Regions:
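Gly/Ser/Thr-rich loops at beta-strand to alpha-helix junctions
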Residues: 7-11, 64-66
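A cross-kingdom feature strongest in bacterial/archaeal respiratory oxidoreductases
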Residues: 32-36, 44-132, 160-318
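Active-site phosphate/pyrophosphate- and oxyanion-stabilizing loops and adjacent acidic/basic residues
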Residues: 16, 20, 73, 93, ...
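Non-catalytic, well-ordered alpha-helical segments in soluble enzyme domains
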Residues: 136-161
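Anionic-ligand anchoring segments at beta-strand to alpha-helix junctions in alpha/beta enzyme folds, i.e.
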Residues: 15-42
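Alpha-helical scaffold segments in soluble metabolic enzymes
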Residues: 13, 17, 45, 49, ...
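Conserved strand-helix element at the start of the C-terminal RecA-like helicase core
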Residues: 2-3
Length: 318
């Protein structure tokens, strides 16, 4: 199977076409993944409305745009000017510390939830313990404000029985933690108008910066977890830091080096990455097999709030 982490439409279409062509057994277009369904244009429109004064209040829940947005300081400055700002959060993070009101929410291990990661693949998350503190789940608060007498658990149960289980028992699904529905999963063909011959050829004198998330740390929501910080990157084997990955060819051309010091630790060159407004300095890792003309930098590092001092590692690539 061929995969890509790029959100570029052309790249995604090329990968789909390749998997269709090689008839990959691991590739199933009839059951797509449904995660990462955010809408960047809606978010950008909201920021423009904040700037123009069309929005006088904002509520955030389970997100930290004060850390993950590009030029997040500009967003936080806009939030500070609002008449009303409320953050539902488990931590005093960058966003919470800039809102007028903060509502403490329970940890995900204290909460109910359901998910559909892939088409027809439904999952339940159950609380493992009672909430340690006097907190209310965000969904329960919304139900209360809407005048409902149900709690979020009741709504999940009702929705599963009505729209998902189709005669199967709720108790069995609760015990298993999941339910698979294979309806409407007939194989489909890919139709693409993309002309590969019209795609631009990469000029290797220029460098493309690829921002990605690591397998262990992800987007940084759990960066205060030392076990995840200690999780070695499957490719570089590096822990407790992010870095700029560079191909051998580009490293040689730019005079970048890696070397081992007396205790066996890996050391090397540092580079400055700039977007014309902000700059960050990061160590370089020369990565065998990386495509010349590309450099990679992991997101999820460089957090400064809701973190103990020893966990403040890496740079914020957002």
């Amino acid at each position: 199977v061929v995969i890509t982490g790029l959100d570029d439409t052309d790249s995604q279409e090329i990968v789909l076409m390749i998997n269709e062509y090689i008839k990959s057994d691991a590739f199933d277009i009839s059951s797509p993944r449904l995660i990462y369904q955010g809408n960047d244009s809606d978010l950008l429109n909201m920021i423009e409305e904040l700037k123009s004064g069309e929005i006088s209040g904002i509520i955030t829940a389970g997100v930290n745009p004060g850390y993950t947005l590009p030029n997040a300081d500009d967003f936080l400055e806009l939030v500070n000017k609002l008449e009303f700002s409320l953050c539902f959060s488990t931590k005093e993070d960058e966003t919470a510390n800039n809102c007028r009101y903060v509502a403490a929410t329970p940890h995900y291990l204290e909460s109910w939830g359901d998910y559909e990661f892939k088409t027809g693949h439904y999952y339940l998350s159950q609380p493992t313990i009672k909430p340690l503190f006097d907190t209310n789940q965000f969904q329960d608060i919304i139900l209360t404000l809407s005048g409902s007498n149900n709690n979020f658990y009741d709504e999940i149960k009702k929705n599963w029985r009505t729209n998902i289980l189709k005669g199967k028992t709720w108790g069995k699904s609760l015990q298993d933690g999941f339910y698979y529905s294979y309806e409407n999963n007939a194989p489909r063909r890919i139709k693409s108008s993309l002309n590969i011959n019209n795609l631009p050829i990469q000029n290797t004198d220029q460098l493309d910066l690829i921002l990605y998330t690591k397998v262990g740390l992800g987007d940084g929501q759990q960066s205060s977890n030392p076990w995840l910080q200690e999780f070695p990157d499957p490719i570089t084997r590096v822990t407790w830091d992010n870095y700029l990955t560079v191909s051998y060819k580009d490293a040689e051309r730019l005079g970048l080096k890696n070397y081992n010091v007396s205790n066996g630790a890996l050391n090397g060159s540092y580079v400055t990455v700039s977007n014309g407004r902000n700059s960050i300095q990061v160590p370089v890792i020369i990565q065998p097999g990386q495509t010349p003309g590309t450099v990679g930098l992991a997101l999820g590092y460089g957090k400064t709030q809701a973190m103990s001092e020893e966990m403040n590692v890496g740079v914020n690539a957002y």
